[in-house]
Amino acid sequence: MSNQNSISRGSVWRKWDLQVHTKGTAKNDQFTSANFDEFCTALFKKALEKEISVVGITDYFSIENYKKVKKFVAEINNLKVSGKKVFSDQEIEDIKGIFILPNVELRMMPSTDSGRLINIHCLFNPDFESSIENDFFGSIEYSAGSGTRFKMNRQGIISLGKSLDSTLVDEAAYKK
């Protein structure tokens, strides 16, 4: 895989996969990986095999798993299983050349004629990662049946979860 920054000619066709849900995704997590590192290893092995240049890490109302994938890539040089490196030096270089961006999936009303919610995908410039939580999620609200409004940032989602079940601790309420 060639480095994205070494383009010296006009248009170049590249493969992008902009909707990659991860282990621990907020809805319908059916991944069988033992842990997040194992999931990321499989993800990047497949991305290298398919020569994917851009990956959008997708989740509902969150960029937490995007941050975990970025952390995985940042620490990839130290990744070992049974004392052996998981990726070769060339694979590590190629993985670090894959452009990874946050893709926030939103579900909204009204529903379609078939009763399904409308999905909207918001792709963000990774340079603005730190402001997504407060500026973006803090400006979106969910109106509960009671009329109570909840911001769709982490604290607002926890409050919403606890309004559904007051016995939940923060992390469980966030996932609810």
Model-found features: residue ranges?
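Extended substrate/RNA-proximal surfaces in nucleic-acid metabolism proteins
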Residues: 2-6, 71-176
